[in-house]
């Protein structure tokens, strides 16, 4: 009886060992993994080799973590030679899908607001797509983390994030003893002039730096709009120390819109910022859209304009 019991136990142990081996083999042979970005989970290749990128803002982040791509979007901006050499698939909002499919990507990276329209076509071709809701500077660190995990370069991503956060802290430390400047951020386009809320790129950096955006006093605190109507009458009442102007569109159309809404009115000349020559036009490359890895440089530019303090990295 004792011998039978020992044999039974031995048999059970063998079965468990075989089962354990089978489970280990199954796990190690998995070809996909699940990654999360801002609460959204994506199934992607375990070790992607052909990453197609439809947005150059995502592309720069991918290469920052030592990732590689097989495509980019067309642009007039100057790119690093390695990025310039990649096949261009057309403008960000108008991708050539035939060309993309011919590249045979194993995963596609794009933006929800630009590339959602291509999602069903990618699905029908069994190509996983990661469409990011990548918008404000708050998304930069999560994006780097995600791309580090996607490419299996987690350590590189952590290093890039550490430098990025250290540089931002350096900018903040440079003005920690300054009286917060009162700022208005105007968005000037060919259609008119509005004011930025904290949801917009430049105003969010103003907030991060501890400056006061005078526009927020007119909001209920729940708005998700990036810009809101803002009259010269309200601007005159707020009378900020500095007016930052972020432009979008053709220069002559913007000038015309600014004259109509603001500068042709005699009240404009009475503004403190105008009288002190503190109306500052900011380059759209850094201040209209998320500047990504250049966020510390953009914030340093705001500090230079607001306080006259140089911050170098």
At which residue positions do the language-model features occur?
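Proline-aspartate-enriched helix->loop->beta-strand connector
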Residues: 97-110, 127, 232-245
């Amino acid at each position: 009886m004792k011998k039978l019991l020992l044999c039974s136990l031995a048999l059970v142990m063998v079965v468990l060992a075989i089962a354990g081996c089978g489970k280990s083999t199954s796990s190690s042979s998995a070809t996909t993994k699940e990654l999360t970005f801002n609460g959204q989970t994506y199934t992607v290749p375990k070790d992607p080799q052909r990453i197609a990128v439809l947005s150059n803002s995502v592309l720069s982040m991918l290469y920052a973590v030592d990732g590689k791509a097989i495509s980019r979007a067309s642009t007039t901006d100057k790119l690093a030679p390695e990025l310039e050499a990649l096949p261009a698939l057309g403008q960000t909002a108008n991708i050539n899908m035939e060309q993309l499919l011919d590249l045979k990507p194993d995963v596609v990276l794009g933006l929800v607001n630009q590339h959602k329209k291509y999602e069903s076509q990618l699905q029908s071709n069994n190509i996983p797509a990661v469409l990011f809701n990548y918008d404000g500077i708050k998304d930069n660190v999560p994006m780097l983390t995600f791309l580090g995990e996607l490419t299996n370069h987690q350590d590189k991503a952590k290093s890039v994030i550490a430098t990025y956060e250290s540089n931002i802290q350096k900018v903040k430390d440079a003005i920690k003893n300054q009286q917060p400047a009162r700022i208005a951020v105007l968005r000037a386009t060919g259609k008119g002039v509005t004011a930025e809320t904290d949801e917009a790129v430049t105003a969010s950096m103003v907030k991060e730096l501890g400056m006061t955006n005078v526009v927020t006093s007119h909001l209920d605190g729940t708005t998700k709009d990036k810009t809101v109507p803002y009259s010269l009458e309200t601007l005159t009442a707020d009378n900020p120390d500095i007016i930052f102007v972020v432009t979008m569109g053709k220069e002559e159309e913007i000038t015309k819109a600014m004259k109509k809404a603001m500068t042709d009115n005699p009240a404009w000349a009475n503004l403190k910022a105008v009288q002190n020559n503190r109306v500052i036009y900011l380059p759209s490359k850094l201040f209209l859209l998320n500047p990504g890895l250049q966020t510390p440089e953009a914030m340093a530019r705001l500090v230079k304009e607001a306080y006259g303090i140089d911050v170098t990295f």
